[in-house]
Curated annotation (Swiss-Prot):
Originating gene: kynB
Coiled-coil ranges from the UniProt annotation: none
Protein task: Catalyzes the hydrolysis of N-formyl-L-kynurenine to L-kynurenine, the second step in the kynurenine pathway of tryptophan degradation.
Name of the protein this chain belongs to: Kynurenine formamidase
A molecular-function term among this protein's GO annotations: zinc ion binding
Cofactor info, note text: Binds 2 zinc ions per subunit.
Length: 212
């Protein structure tokens, strides 16, 4: 079964939140140079680089860290929802009727996703808190977006982040859904096991959902 890569590429050219740690890649050893028998690389980056999961610790001082997040939230049935290109935010009417297991994880495809990996967007399509509460009522365990944040980029009170925290929904940001049609899929998006982390990079993929 073919996999669809929905992850941002990570390189020194990858755009990051203004003021955040930029991606730094260096070779610490090169084969056949300096008597080394192997190539070794060193990578320095923000926990929020590219496609990543936010842990509750990101917005709550004593919140749950990435290594404590339940792994079953990151694997299983998912639905890609295509939000109107002109929509200023993701509202309850965009989610429609979510059915059964395919509603366990919802990924929003918005106009935010058109920015290339090396360009930070001027604005994003945020998710309204009432949308998040509607998703929680439908039994959703994970919400994903192709935006680098579920809130407006200039937000300081972070209402969507806190709504996700209050409802216990996992927050997956920075997806690449440009060429993914809306519909049912299986999501696999396991975060790095960073002890005490506020967030963690993810390699996220989709594959066609198995027949019900």
């Amino acid at each position: 079964m073919a996999l669809i890569d929905i992850s941002r590429s990570v390189s020194p050219a990858t755009a990051v939140w203004p003021g955040d740690q930029e991606v730094q890649w260096t070779w610490t050893a090169r084969r056949n140079e300096d008597e080394s028998s192997v190539n070794l690389g060193s990578l320095r980056l923000s926990t929020h680089t590219g496609t990543h999961v936010d842990a509750p610790l990101h917005v709550k001082r004593q919140g749950q860290a990435t290594d404590d997040l339940p792994l079953d939230s990151f694997v299983g049935p998912a639905r890609v929802v295509d939000v109107n290109a002109n929509a200023p935010s993701v509202r309850p009417e965009h989610i429609g009727q979510l059915d059964g297991a395919s509603a366990e994880r919802v990924l929003f495809k918005t106009s935010s996703g058109v920015s290339p990996d090396d360009e930070w967007p001027d604005a994003v399509v945020p998710i309204q808190p009432d949308t998040i509460h509607a998703l929680a009522d439908a039994g959703v365990s994970l919400v994903g977006t192709d935006a680098p944040s579920v809130d407006p980029l200039d937000s300081t009170d972070l209402p969507a982040h806190h709504a996700l925290l209050d409802t216990g929904i996992v927050n997956l940001e920075g997806l690449v859904l440009t060429n993914v049609p809306p519909g049912r899929y299986e999501l696999i998006a396991l975060p790095l096991k960073i002890v005490g982390g506020d967030a963690a990079p993810v390699r996220a993929v989709l594959r066609d959902a198995p027949d019900p």
